[in-house]
């Protein structure tokens, strides 16, 4: 039997009820706890950067180390285990670092330039080849130090793995809190991928659902109930300007962007039944894509732009189907388990993250679209809203804990697990930026 709360959330009919869970209101950044999967990580030594002049407001080396640790690919050595603190390449005794088992070594310095500006230098060395792999210097204002640390972590990650890092990306999510007088407050927030620098995009006394990033990362589409009914908005993050793109009678929900950013796939019930539509954002033209008496919902646009995967109960239970954007017959994709929903494409288009339900439990799973192999990744029981990292290595999702709704992340091999919580608030509806 399908899970009523999850399925009602999918179709949008009972979205208000989904969010009626009390929680105290304390605004805070997301805190991230690595809960598993560091055993196979590559040891790397990140020496605290030397400070010259005034003390910088950010510990650049610590931010880099935390980024690399969260990736699950690297295990920064504890600071107390560092046998020395070389300031320059000539200070490095490579054999000492090899004895510690470190594969790489990062050194650097932060130089105060005055007028609230800093120069940051860093070098990455291969311990076994005894050579520099990369080195850079940057000048940034004090407020830009943390972002620069993320950039350096991206560069280190790419140099050592050959893959793009994700440390300068962002996450969108929705929090719900209870004010002192008992009223609920919903907030759509955007934060750095490590949970820092959160800022509020929208506050409302009514639920906010389904944030979706535009392909260029400059806009968010989302569903708001601020006018006491569902409505889909698109909002510019830089200016805060927004426009309503779907406010028809009935359900307006589940926006997802086309890869070129020119269209939105939506769920509308303006003709009586929840169906998938495509809205051209430039012309306003609306095209109905599905025609079925069942519930069709949760569209996910394929990265090549040619098809859309969606959830439908046309076979009796929620399963995933794929349909060409030009229209035609939908093909069923999932057959393993009684419930498969909430598809999210990997950036390469070869895999889907989804919610797999069986025997009353709902887990994050990955479906290989070529082999049709389904791999369940999580052991938590009430998972929702999977969203791939832009490099395809991690999946962000919402789940439940004894303290309420939290976010979590899992690597696509299931090895690395993280938990993201915000003190005092329910946290739901995650979306990872491009």
UniProtKB/Swiss-Prot annotation:
Q: Where in the cell is it found?
A: Periplasm
Query: Which GO CC terms are listed, alphabetically?
Result: periplasmic space
Query: Major place of localization?
Result: periplasm
Q: Which Pfam families match?
A: PD40, TolB_N
Protein's GO biological process = cell division; protein import
Identify the InterPro entries for this entry.
Answer: 6-blade_b-propeller_TolB-like, PD40, Tol-Pal_TolB, TolB_N
**What are the TM regions of this chain, as residue ranges?**
none
Keywords from the UniProt entry: Cell cycle, Cell division, Periplasm, Signal
Q: Give the signal sequence positions.
A: 1-28
Where are the coiled-coil regions?
Answer: none
Q: Which Gene3D superfamilies match?
A: TolB, C-terminal domain, TolB, N-terminal domain
Subunit info here reads: The Tol-Pal system is composed of five core proteins: the inner membrane proteins TolA, TolQ and TolR, the periplasmic protein TolB and the outer membrane protein Pal. They form a network linking the inner and outer membranes and the peptidoglycan layer.
Entry similarity comment: Belongs to the TolB family.
Biological role stated in the UniProt entry: Part of the Tol-Pal system, which plays a role in outer membrane invagination during cell division and is important for maintaining outer membrane integrity.
Among PANTHER family, the record links this protein to:
PROTEIN TOLB, PROTEIN TOLB HOMOLOG
**Annotated protein name in UniProt:** Tol-Pal system protein TolB
Q: Which gene encodes it?
A: tolB
């Amino acid at each position: 039997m399908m899970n009523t709360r999850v399925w009602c959330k999918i179709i949008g009919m009972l979205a208000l009820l989904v969010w009626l869970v009390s929680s105290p209101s304390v605004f805070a950044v997301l805190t991230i706890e690595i809960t598993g999967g560091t055993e196979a990580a590559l040891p790397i030594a990140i020496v605290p950067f030397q400070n010259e002049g005034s003390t910088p407001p950010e510990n650049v080396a610590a931010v880099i180390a935390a980024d690399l640790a969260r990736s699950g690919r690297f295990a920064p050595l504890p600071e107390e285990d560092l046998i020395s603190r070389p300031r320059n390449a000539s200070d490095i005794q490579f054999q000492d670092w090899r004895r510690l088992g470190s594969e790489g070594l990062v050194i650097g310095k932060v130089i105060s330039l005055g007028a609230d500006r800093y120069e940051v230098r860093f070098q990455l060395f291969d311990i076994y080849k005894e050579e520099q792999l990369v080195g850079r210097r940057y000048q940034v204002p004090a407020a830009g130090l943390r972002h620069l640390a993320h950039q350096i972590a991206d560069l280190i990650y790419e140099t050592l793995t050959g893959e793009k890092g994700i440390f300068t990306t962002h996450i969108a999510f929705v929090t719900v809190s209870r004010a002192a007088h008992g009223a609920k407050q919903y907030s759509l927030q955007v934060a750095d991928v490590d949970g820092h620098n959160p800022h509020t995009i929208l506050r409302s006394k009514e639920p906010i659902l389904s944030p979706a990033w535009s392909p260029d990362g400059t806009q968010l589409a989302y569903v708001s109930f601020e006018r006491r009914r569902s409505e889909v908005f698109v909002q510019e993050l830089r200016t805060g300007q927004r426009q309503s793109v779907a406010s028809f009678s009935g359900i307006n929900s589940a926006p997802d962007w086309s890869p070129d950013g020119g269209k939105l796939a939506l769920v509308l019930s303006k003709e009586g039944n929840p169906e998938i539509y495509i809205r051209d954002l430039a012309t306003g033209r609306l095209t109905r894509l599905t025609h079925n008496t069942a519930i069709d919902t949760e569209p996910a646009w394929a990265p090549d732009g040619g098809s859309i995967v969606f959830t439908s109960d046309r076979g009796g239970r929620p399963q995933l189907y794929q349909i060409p954007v030009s229209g035609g017959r939908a093909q069923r994709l999932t057959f393993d388990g009684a419930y498969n929903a909430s598809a999210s494409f990997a950036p390469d288009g070869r895999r889907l993250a989804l919610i797999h339900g069986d025997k009353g439990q709902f887990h994050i799973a990955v479906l290989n679209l070529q082999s049709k192999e389904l791999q369940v990744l999580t052991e938590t029981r009430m998972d929702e809203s999977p969203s791939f990292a832009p490099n395809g290595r991690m999946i962000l999702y919402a789940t439940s804990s004894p303290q309420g709704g939290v976010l979590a992340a899992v690597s696509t091999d299931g090895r690395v697990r993280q938990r993201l919580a915000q003190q005092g608030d329910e946290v739901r509806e995650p979306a990872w930026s491009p």
